[in-house]
Amino acid sequence: MLLIIACGNSLRSDDGAGLIFAERLEYACRALDVVVERISVHQLLPELAADIAAEVVQAVVFVDTRLAAPGDLPALQPLSLKAASPSVGHHLTPAVLLLYAQALYHHCPPAWQITIPGVNFDHGESLSETAQNALAHVSVLARQITARLDDPRRNAKEL
């Protein structure tokens, strides 16, 4: 099963683009016969480590929006435990959640991050042209994810 963890706030303009992208990604992956579960949150929480470490999870994709220049495109980036630094603060990164999953539950599936470019994070529910354009790349990234799920050697190298 592919676990998609979407992070964002639909009331902060482009910050909600990650949530929309993740929902569309879920449907695109299902259309490619991938079993998917999607979790949407405002921020990453330590409790998500248990979901990540579940036996049925083959891989995890984190989706979030970041401040970017107009014209930037979303990309699938591998995550590594090597880049994780334990945190006791109020902000967790995807890599730290993977580290928690490994340390607490002894299971850490391959993981990637998709960052959606955004330029407007003011209060509101409309998306900028930059964020809207990013949503058009869902099917391409769904195919990239599916290809990685089908190649366990590639998954092992990324962690």
Language-model segments: residues:
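N-terminal catalytic or cofactor-binding beta/alpha core of small enzyme domains
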Residues: 1-116, 125-137, 143-152, 156-159
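Short, internal active-site loops enriched in acidic
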Residues: 118-120
